[in-house]
């Protein structure tokens, strides 16, 4: 899979001249959307199938600040995959600082039908479940 790389923008900085903590969560979302697009599952496809995918939980641990114009690489991996929900891990590396780990975090998601009922991923979204399990196996083989 293609790596997700982006530059830190000036408007993302705070008064101290570093990237505001809330932007790391946005970057994680950008990387997640990019990963799903690469796997052939853009959000629009889920919506066309009648599913939504809310974020159930998000957390981020900050290790070292990122500054304006730094280039970051975000590596997304599958941490857990269950029948109803799955968790992704994000490792955010500052490539402008020699690839140093700047932050890491997780997001947990589920799928709901438009009427709000939960989806059993392994039964109702078998193709997606298999794709995600393949992603997990690729990580184990690295």
Label the model's feature ranges.
Residues 12, 16-21, 29, 59, ...:
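Anionic, Ser/Thr-rich low-complexity intrinsically disordered regions
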Residues 35-86, 100, 104:
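Hydrophobic beta-strand-centered segment that forms part of the acyl-chain substrate-binding groove
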Residues 2-4, 37, 67-68, 79-142:
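HotDog/MaoC-like acyl-thioester-processing domains
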Residues 7, 59, 108:
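Short aromatic/hydrophobic contact patches that present stacked aromatics
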Residues 1-30, 34-35:
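Catalytic strand-loop segment that frames the active site of acyl-thioester-processing enzymes
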